[in-house]
Amino acid sequence: TQRDTLTKGMTQGQIVAGPDDTKIDQSIMDQGVCATIALPFDIHVAQSVKNVMFMFAWTQKHGLAVNNLVILGVPGYLNMWKRFGESTDEPSESSKRCCYEKPTDPVSGEIVTPAFDPADEISEITHQEESADIKPVRLLDARLLGYTWVTQNHSWIVAYSDEPIKDGNEVVTLRNIGNNNFCDALRKCTDKSACIHQYLQFAWNSFGDPTVRTRQVVFEVVGWADSDTTNNNSDTLFYRTTQADNWQVLTESKTNTIGLAEVDWFNFKYETKQEVSIEIARQTWTSTLNAGVSTVSRVPKVPIKVKINVDTFLKVLFAVYKADLYDIFLQFASVFKKGGNRQYWLNYTQEPNTKSNYNHKIYNDKIRYLQEDVQVHPNETQSKWWWWSFKKVALTTMTVVALTRFKASGINGQYISARQFSGGETVSPYRLAAPFDSCLWRRSPNPLGTDGLKVALAHHPLAGASNRNKLRVSIPAQCICSITA
């Protein structure tokens, strides 16, 4: 439908497609349509268009009214609407809600970023040939319990756990099991490394039999933790990682390459911060945090009936893509849920050949949900990789993926970008110069000329000597930064 539908009054269940500059023009009026084909238009969505952090009245007071239609975003009236000028603060049709159409899959350049399907992801990682696309394991959806991983000699094997074994009051999952439960040639072991989960009551799911590829272990166990009323610790889940004495990788044993250590604080979903993660680190066993022990237990408090995901993965995952995939698209849509000034901090160095320190860190520690799609340019050497890191996911800083120099980066949502470089570069409000070439900000899918989208400089790099080499730019929603290297 056309934009003038709003002028004439919305028809129940009708989708109104409008311009990109306001999501209110993309609305649906209906009793329950929001829950099926649309997303609710609330204060968090409005925040990506205009600062409405004090949205305690109808939205015409904040410049968001559209053709006599106003939306209430305060608690208790979320997504309600009424006509402008009505005397009551109650919605004129309280059974209706205002929504906006669910966005389509993000597009980076002309390459469509496919929707994430766990089954497809697992199949690609574990069953395809060496030359096939390898996607990073999704590490950034704020797992409730924490992380464990195994790594050795910068090499990797991908293998998902077999069906969990219920043993008394424990659930045991064995890593890297080959045919008939025997290890293949890559792992010379009799007693395999095992994760033991002391459960309350679990309903387990599994991704089926594992498939071994090259040299990394990755597996996931998913279950529900229910309160066990027969014990005093009725809301406690015990997660314990054990390591067999004779567990070996090739010719190297845990005594000289594999260690067991605790990881950093993890933000538990319903509680305060608790240190619940465990790391099997590649370092001398006797130098790890828990030297001389093979078991580490943590006791996070688990609310009644909560889903528990236990992931095992490498600390560093390397992704190689086909030659025609060269864009990077970072989708931050799920970050902007609780309001607030979400900021991201990007650091860049002129010396990628000697320093792996291209970091992407969360500037605001309150951000907990983040999704990532990464595509890299092939045929680059390791000396040209930069590293992307995300802060406050499971570790203070977690290296997610090593990738070659990027071509384009897209952000969905308002954010602050800071580029740091050396030298007295001349920077205009329209084109952002950088040592490796240039960065043009443009609106997607319709670029606004060669100078890109005009952006407001929150902090000019030439404003003072202390900030001479730093540029901070506020970017409106749905812009793409094209980088040519």
Curated annotation (Swiss-Prot):
Post-translational modifications reported in the UniProt record: The N-terminus is blocked.
A single BP term in Gene Ontology: killing of cells of another organism
SUPFAM superfamilies attached to this UniProt entry: Aerolisin/ETX pore-forming domain
Gene3D superfamilies reported for this sequence: Proaerolysin, chain A, domain 3
InterPro entries per UniProt: Aerolysin-like_C
Keywords: Cytolysis, Disulfide bond
Cystine crosslinks: 34-98, 183-189
Family statement: Belongs to the aerolysin family.
The protein's role, per its UniProt record: Cytolytic protein with insecticidal activity. Acts as a pro-inflammatory agent.
Self-association state and partner proteins as the record states: Oligomerizes as a hexamer.
Protein name (database record): Cytolytic protein enterolobin
